[in-house]
Amino acid sequence: MENKTEVPRGGRRQRSRRPAADASSSKTEDKRQRMTPRKPRPIHRPWTLYAPPRIAEDPSVPLAASTFRFMSFNVLADYLVINGRENEPAKHHQKYDWEYRSVRLMKEILRWSPHIVNLQEVDHFEDFFEPRMKKAGFVGVYKRRTGENTHDGCAIFVKKSMFRIVSSHPIEYHVLDHPVLDRDNIALTAVVEAKNSVGGPSPARFVVTNTHLLFNPNRGEIKLAQLDMLLKHLTSLRKEHNAILPVLLSGDFNLAPHSPLYHFLSTGKLDASGLSRYGLSGQNLDTYALKKAARVNENDRTRHHGNGTAFGKFDSYRAQRDDFRVYKPNTVYSHELDFASAYAQLPDDKCTGEPKFTIFHSGSKATVDYIWYTRSSLHCHGVVEMIPAGLLFKHDELPTTEHSSDHLSLVADFSLR
C-alpha cells in the first residue's frame, strides 16, 4: 500500500513546533540580544571641492597622476580608553573594546582610499596597524612617545605603489634641562618620493610631518616651544635637501582656531610679549555660545562658521600676572613655511573658517586637528567635511558604535604645483 502523508483540513501541512526552551537557554538568548549591537552604518560626510579636477563625491573616479589623497586621524589609544571607564554602564563597554574598535578604525581609514596616512595615539602599531596597513598596500614608520607610562605615538603610512619613504626623522620634544621642553610629546617627519613623477626630470619629493602636541590647556608656553622646535626642524630639513620641498604637516595640535598659536602657524609670526600661557592655545574659551548655535542650526553650510576670530585678534589673552607669561616674554617667533590650513574656508573678520569640531567627547568639543600645507608648492583640491554639529550633539560623546574614535578623521586631496 502506498504511504501518504495525511493533510489536515484546509489543505495545509502543519509545521512542527520547536520544543519550549528551558529557562537557562532563554536567559542566554536574551543576553545575546542585549550584547549584540545593531550593525553600525558610517555617518555621511560630503566632499567640498576647491577646484574641479575630478568628481570627489565618487571615490571610484581615478585621481590624476599628480594628485594624491592625504588623511590625518587620531585613532584614540587603546590604553587611554581603558583608563577611567570602570564606572560606565555595561551597555557602553563594547564600543570601547579594542577588538570592536580596531575593525571600525581600519574601515574608517580605508573608506576614503587615502594614499598617505598620518595617525596619532597609535599604541598597537606592530600587532595591528602595521600588518593591516601592509595588507592594504602601505608601508610605514612609527615613533612612540618618550615617557615610561605613555604607550602611544605617531605613525606615517604611504601607499607603496605610489610613494617610497626616502628617510624618516623622529623628533622628541623632551630636552634635558630645558626650562619648558620637559614633556614626552613627539613628532615624526618623513621625506617622501613619488614613484611616478610627472613633469620633471627627477622624482618629486616632499615632506610629511605628523605630531601630537601637549594637551594641557593651561600650559601654552610648552606648546609654543614644541611648535617652534618642530618648525625649525622642518626649515632645516628643507635646507639639507638643497630644495624648497613642499611640506604637509598634520596632527592633533591641541590648539583652537582663535588662538595665538593658530595665528603663529597661519601667518608665520607671533609676538609673544606678555601673552598668557593660560590662553596661548585657546582651549579655555567658553564654548557655550558655539554649542547653543550648533543645536539651533544644523545647516551644513554653517559648519565652518563660529570658530575663532580674525587673525591677530587675541588681546584677551594678554597676561594679567607675571607667573602666567611665557618663558621668553619678549620673543618674537617666526617661520617661513607659508602654511595654509586645508579646512579653513571663507575666513572673514569674525572667524577663521575652520570646522566647528574635530574632537567630540565629554572633556572637549572643539577643533584641535589640522592639515597644514605649503601653499606655494601644494594645491588643495578639496576636503571631506566634518559631521554636522547638530548631529554630533545628538550623541553624548564620541566614540559611538558607529565611530570608534573621539576624533574625526581629516581627508584632503592635494597635487604638487
Predicted regions and their residues:
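Metal-dependent phosphoester-hydrolase catalytic domains
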Residues: E2-E57, D228, T235-L248, F253-R417
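Structured beta-strand-rich core segments of catalytic domains in phosphoester-bond hydrolases
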Residues: R38-T67, K107, I116-F215, R219, ...
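Active-site beta-strand/loop signature of hydrolases that rely on acidic residues for catalysis
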Residues: R69-V75, R104-F129, F157, A190, ...
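Acidic/histidine-rich helix-loop elements
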Residues: V75-E99, P179-V180, P217
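Short coil/turn segments at secondary-structure boundaries
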Residues: N83-N87, P131, R145, S168-I171, ...
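Short, acidic/polar
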Residues: D97-L110, K365
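Active-site beta-loop-alpha substructure in enzyme catalytic cores
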Residues: F215-P217, E221-S236
